[in-house]
Amino acid sequence: MPMVIHSTSASWGTALKPITNSSSDTITPNPNLITTSRGSSTRPSYITTLTAKKMEQLLPMVINTWNMSEANEMAWRILQQSEGGVRQTRNAVVEGVTRCEELQCFHSVGYGGSPDERGETTLDAMVMDGGLMDVGAVGGLRNIKEAIRVARFVLEHTSHTLLVGQSATDFAVSMGFRTSSLVTPWSHDEWEKWKAKNCQPNCWLNVNPDPKLSCGPYVPKATPLTRWKEDRARNEYEIGENNHDTIGMIAIDVENQIHTGTSTNGMTHKIPGRVGDSPIVGAGSYADNEVGAAVATGDGDVMMRFLPSLLAVEAMRNGKSPQEAAELGIKRIAKYYKDFIGAVIAVNRLGQYAAACYGIPEFPYMISNPTHTVSVQTVKCLPYVHVEPLPKS
């Protein structure tokens, strides 16, 4: 198996310096400025003057989706290997998420969960470097358990962003990873029970025979397509910790170096070949050292259409608070998909964070920083958004 803790190097890019002021406890305004692509600077309206003592309470930090505490604990432990977590953020997200893959968190991460229509489990994962704006990702990875480690190898050993399917497996094998079945007795039993229920629910639309009554095989209907939302509601699928979900993690050191990581085994009973939002840049996660980062979780087929993580980071770039940014990422989706279920966590480069969710009562997430060690926090979800039906064409 390949080495999993890599030595760090200056090639990760020049990190922003810690915000300090030797003459006073009060932070000077300049570090709070965010430089735009044209070189002008604006101070986000939500950032008040922070004291040096307050800054020490925010960074370094690790935050991740859902109540996946052992992943958070592992990442936090790795950040502690250097003062202020410096140069450990990549190791932290990769090994923190790997811990969840090993534990098969809620059967929604790692091997042995979310069987597709053929009973096979496949994995999606991503790592993003917010300094170099570099990404490595895999989608539909077969027969390799360490999905996020393979994504790291894509980042560090190729010029590509995303490798998929059996070819991603072939790449992993060439890099020294070992193959093994991702099917377990539990996942096989779940698949058998699904088939015994006439393959309900499934992901087929506008086909014959009726996918609500049959396992197929299917052929396209000869009639004009109906609007997808009129044909089937998203809430037929129970989305949450146990299905159709992701661990998304953000790590920031005291020099404001940011990495994000994601991993999932995707949607249960998906059509083979389906890739969700987790390995898609701007959907599953996004990071920019100059601004902050965001991760998303939930109904990936819908979420990737809106790039909520990118949307949240760009909102913070334009002066929104982490809370406003996270809510914007959610509300943009709910405007069009009232049955959507999902959540977004947003963190600015100073370590201030917030979460927003929709379609479920509440959303738990994990945080570790100098004042909260492996602490679970919960946010109440946004209320139902009434959407007027679109006029029929």
Swiss-Prot record:
It catalyses: N(4)-(beta-N-acetyl-D-glucosaminyl)-L-asparagine + H2O = N-acetyl-beta-D-glucosaminylamine + L-aspartate + H(+). GO terms for biological process: protein deglycosylation; proteolysis. Heterotetramer of two alpha and two beta chains arranged as a dimer of alpha/beta heterodimers. Gene3D superfamilies: (Glycosyl)asparaginase. It comes from the Eukaryota. Residues 19-41 have a biased composition (Polar residues). GO terms for molecular function: N4-(beta-N-acetylglucosaminyl)-L-asparaginase activity; peptidase activity. Its EC number is 3.5.1.26. Residues 15-41 are annotated as: Disordered. This is Putative N(4)-(beta-N-acetylglucosaminyl)-L-asparaginase GH22932. GO terms for cellular component: lysosome. Disulfide bonds join 100-105, 199-215, 357-381. Cleaves the GlcNAc-Asn bond which joins oligosaccharides to the peptide of asparagine-linked glycoproteins. Belongs to the Ntn-hydrolase family.
